[in-house]
């Protein structure tokens, strides 16, 4: 049976009492629809945050996620939105090349091992 990392992330977010909308579809300026694993609502402290929790954290994931994000954020309504990627480091460290690529694009990366510590600060309203 295939396990989805996003399901494990959802369980951890629930245990941290972080509220989110799961499986959000957003149409980009290309007219393609892009799926995001989680949406964290805008608040007085944070902009709207879109979040991906990919099963793999590699070059292909970077390309897939960044195309969808670039297309999504070009909409003027989402100009101030941010992207967060939660990486699965439970069995192996996050791939350095993918980590660097996301950071070079201004994407916040949260390793799963740090999620319990960082979620209440960075993802809660």
Q: Can you say where each PLM-predicted feature lies in the sequence?
A:
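A short acidic/basic microdomain associated with nuclease active sites
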Residues: 10-30
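Active-site beta-strand-loop-beta-strand hairpin of nuclease catalytic cores
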Residues: 39-50
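A short, glycine/Asx- and small/polar-enriched loop/turn
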Residues: 32-35
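Glycine-rich phosphate-binding "P-loop"
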Residues: 53-58
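Charged, structured surface patches that assemble and position nucleic-acid processing machinery
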Residues: 1, 7-11, 15, 59-125
């Amino acid at each position: 049976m295939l396990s989805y990392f996003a399901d494990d992330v959802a369980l951890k977010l629930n245990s941290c009492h972080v509220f989110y909308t799961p499986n959000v579809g957003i149409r980009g300026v290309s007219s393609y629809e892009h799926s995001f694993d989680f949406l964290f609502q805008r608040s007085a402290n944070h902009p709207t945050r879109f979040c991906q929790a990919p099963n793999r954290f590699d070059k292909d994931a970077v390309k897939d996620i960044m195309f969808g994000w670039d297309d999504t954020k070009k909409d003027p309504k989402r100009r101030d939105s941010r992207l967060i990627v939660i990486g699965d480091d439970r069995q192996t460290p996050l791939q350095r090349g993918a980590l660097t690529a996301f950071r070079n694009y201004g994407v916040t990366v949260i390793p799963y091992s740090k999620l319990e510590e960082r979620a209440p600060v960075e993802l809660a309203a």
